[in-house]
A protein has these predicted regions:
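Glycine-rich beta-strand-to-loop/alpha-helix junction loops that act as flexible
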Residues: 10, 68-69, 213-215
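Hydrophobic "anchor" residues on beta-strands that sit immediately upstream
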Residues: 5, 63, 211
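Conserved acidic, metal-coordinating active-site core of Asp-based
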Residues: 100-222
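A short acidic, helix-capping loop that chelates divalent metal ions and anchors anionic groups
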Residues: 14-16, 51, 73-76, 182-184
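Conserved Rossmann-like nucleotide-cofactor binding loop
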Residues: 13, 48, 218
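Short, small/polar residue-rich loop motifs at catalytic or cofactor-binding pockets
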Residues: 1-2, 66, 206
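Asp-based phosphoryl-transfer active-site loop
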Residues: 2-19, 223
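Active-site phosphate-binding/coordination module
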Residues: 21-121
Length: 223
């Protein structure tokens, strides 16, 4: 079968953790795939507004599977799939992270915002040698314009179980980055695979004609 679509995670896959952007050799390899006639989608936990040109280093995806499948666009920016957290989910997260002194951010249309303990994220970005991409949102008013696609945070992994015990009825899932304290926080229905299905539908192809690459727990659906 001829493959028509290649879906690639960014952080840890296209961009090695120790580098501030996608390396030139990876950009060249992806462009070669596109030149061969295969469409390329980035499939990431980041929202579209949290992916800078500098990060991609010249890479131009044909499709964007962002916010772990909740924000899906074509190259022109047309929305193919859009799913949001509700107010109850969002406020429960804010209360919990404030109570435990941990960092919490949300992914919005215009980028990611740090709502709780933003300074923790800034320190982490400096330590990881990546450009700052999270807005200071500690005024906690960005959601009055539109609700977020997803959340992300930094907390001891044991605290995620405490959150589930208290707010399990909300269906939120904590997907940690390996053994670290960083995580994506997704709704029960949210998955990169839903974004992949939306892209395949837009292309008029069967998902079996797609190939995916990723390295994290939020990539399991597309793999």
């Amino acid at each position: 079968m001829q493959y028509q679509l290649l879906a690639l995670d960014i952080d840890g896959t296209l961009r090695p953790d120790a580098q501030p952007c996608v390396p030139r050799e990876n950009v060249a390899a992806v462009k070669a795939v596109q030149k061969a006639g295969v469409k390329v989608a980035v499939a990431t936990g980041r929202c579209r507004g949290g992916i800078s040109k500098a990060l991609l280093n010249g890479l131009r995806p044909d499709y964007w599977i962002c916010a772990a499948g909740a924000e899906v666009q074509d190259a022109a920016g047309n929305m193919l799939h859009d799913a949001r957290m509700d107010a109850q989910q969002m406020y429960a997260l804010v209360d919990f992270f404030e109570d435990h002194g941990c960092f919490l951010g949300f992914n919005f249309d215009d980028g990611p915002y740090g709502y709780v303990n933003y300074y923790i994220q800034r320190e982490a970005e400096l330590a990881m040698n990546v450009n700052s991409y999270v807005h200071d949102g500690e005024d906690q008013d960005r959601h009055l314009e539109s609700m977020p696609f997803s959340a992300f945070g930094r907390l001891p992994q044991a605290l995620a179980e405490q959150f589930r015990q208290k707010y399990g009825h909300l269906g939120l899932r904590f997907l940690f980055y390996g053994s670290s304290e960083g995580c994506d926080i997704l709704t029960a229905e949210q998955d990169k695979s839903r974004g992949l299905e939306a892209v395949c539908a837009a292309m008029g192809i069967d998902p079996a004609q797609a190939v995916a690459m990723g390295d994290g727990s939020n990539d399991c659906g597309i793999l």
